[in-house]
Amino acid sequence: VNSRAEKFAGVDGAKGAWVVAVFDGSRLTWTGCSSVAEVLEHTRDCARVGVDMPLSLPVDGYRISELEAKAFLGRARSSIFHTPVVDVLDASTYEQACALSRSITGKAISKQTWHILPAVQAWREADFDPDIYVEVHPECSFRAMSPTTPFASKKSGRGVGQRLAALGRLSEHLDLGDLPDGPVVDDFLDAAAAAWSARRFHVGEHRTFGTADASDRIVA
């Protein structure tokens, strides 16, 4: 199989919608999708797809994959916030979610976590192959992509430049002149990094945090 001829995608959440980056072996392009169903339709011919969203939830405690990924990130560990326990998905208010989380883990959840719960739930309800759609964390991907780069915040100009330079090794053709309207620049960069990890997973060059199967796995 010639992996250069195959397509790989990366998916990143963008304020209630999704950015999908597709790498076809030479060119990297981006598309906006309004739902998980649309993401699945857009990526159905891709060999592997990296998703920057928790695809497994713990029953109690923390996921091993996140603990290992935090250790890998070092000073950038705060870019990973812990996935809540599955019972929290039943909460209808932030206060209720915090109470449920405290009763099981002893800790509340962050507002940031609360705001991504609808997206987490959307992926839980979706029908996809967990060996094709794999969870990734873009900051882990960028550090695996360029281990010697001291990445600045992705919100800074320096950080954007560093990530673009790293992605340039994946593709010389970054279609930055025709990005979908709406998402901010780091959403596009994160989706591209997710596509990079999807390709790595496909060819067996990836790094795994957590389990070898999809039960608690992040790949980079």
What is each of the regions a protein language model found here?
Residues 2-220:
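RNase H-like (RuvC/DEDD) metal-dependent nuclease/polynucleotide-processing core
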